[in-house]
Amino acid sequence: MYIIAGLGNPGKEYEGTRHNVGFMVIDALSKKLGIEVSRLKFKSLMGEGHFKGEKVILLKPQTFMNLSGEALYDAVNFYKIPLENVIVVYDDKDLEVGKIRIRRKGSSGGHNGMNSIIYLLNSEDFPRVRIGIGKPEDGDLVRHVLGRFSDEEKKVIDEAVERAAEAVIDIMENGIEHAMSRFNG
């Protein structure tokens, strides 16, 4: 069994923002795996299905970014799932736009959604797929993460979202080491 959580902020006003690339990846996975993400449970929009005989839960926490851990904590405790089968997908300002980085575990890197998850799960030992959104040119991080991609960036991000969805599938199918060697550039 796997829980895949894509981080973002709920609401139409946040759709397409840099901070919501995690939601975009869940939408891509929803299509690829045929799992509808529409039920409200665990403070999230969720969908449940199967991939290669394994149960898969897709989550889009509706708590707002800084409280993402509340949603994931509820789901992990309900299903009693080992943390190595929890995959978190989120934006990373320290990676250039469209770059993907997969890690087996690690710190939050200053990402508040990840801070919340690590704090409430009391562990850094779960896989994550990070998608680069680049650094703000003017230094205003809040405006940057809540801002939209330029037309040029959008093309790169659309491809990155598809690659990130493929990376998650690769983790489930072939393990994290395989996915890291295939997708970390």
Swiss-Prot record:
The keyword tRNA-binding applies. One of its GO terms (molecular function) is tRNA binding. Keywords: Cytoplasm, Hydrolase, RNA-binding, tRNA-binding. TRNA binds at residues 14, 64, 66, 112. The record marks 91 as: Stabilizes the basic form of H active site to accept a proton. GO terms for cellular component: cytoplasm. Its main location: cytoplasm. It is found in: Cytoplasm. Transmembrane segments: none annotated. Its EC number is 3.1.1.29. Gene3D superfamilies: Peptidyl-tRNA hydrolase. Disulfide bonds: none annotated. It comes from the Bacteria. Monomer. This is Peptidyl-tRNA hydrolase. It comes from Caldanaerobacter subterraneus subsp. tengcongensis (strain DSM 15242 / JCM 11007 / NBRC 100824 / MB4).
